[in-house]
Design a protein with these regions (language model features):
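Short, Lys/Arg-enriched N-terminal segments with co-localized hydrophobic residues
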Residues: 1-8
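Basic, polyanion-binding surface patches
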Residues: 8-161
Length: 161
């Protein structure tokens, strides 16, 4: 193993390429704001604590869902299964925004969630912290469901696995 390769790209480019080596689970963050449904594909989801149960999500400030996130607002993290690659692409494409809730597996009564996801983690926003282009969202877990079969959709080096 050697890191002796000399890179002439910017720090940002080198960092971006280094981060592409990480394998991420793929989730969709969903919420309802004044009756409007919101969903966005996220890969930056991390558990913080079991006491209290909480997680952290980073949301780009330019995302539509961003301005709906307020202290106390509710959302769901839907961990996707390997059959949900197309839905992940739809929820990450601004041009497909109106198609995000056409999948028959959405339950939109209350906080929207995907009934066929690997897991659903229901949260309330506990803290919002601005960091340059993103907001760090801390969610207090209210409930969680999971599938018995493990078949999680992952993403590495620009590809689903």
């Amino acid at each position: 193993f050697s890191l002796s390769i000399i890179h002439t790209m910017s720090i940002q480019d080198n960092f971006r390429l280094a981060m592409r080596r990480y394998i991420y689970s793929v989730s969709i963050m969903s919420s309802k704001d004044d009756g409007y449904l919101n969903a966005i594909t996220v890969s930056s989801v991390t558990s913080i604590s079991m006491d209290p149960p909480s997680l952290l999500i980073c949301i780009n400030k330019s995302a539509r869902i961003h301005d709906t996130l307020k202290i106390g607002s509710e959302f769901c993290i839907n961990l996707l299964n390997k059959d949900q690659e197309e839905l992940s692409n739809i929820c990450s494409d601004e041009d497909s925004y109106d198609e995000r809730f056409k999948d028959k597996n959405w339950n939109t009564k209350g906080v929207p969630f995907l009934a066929n996801a690997q897991a659903n983690i229901f949260c309330k926003v506990d803290k919002l912290s601005s960091y340059h282009t993103h907001t760090i969202v801390v969610g207090l877990v209210q409930d969680a469901n999971y599938s018995d079969e493990i078949s999680t959709l992952t993403y590495v080096d620009g590809n689903y696995k």
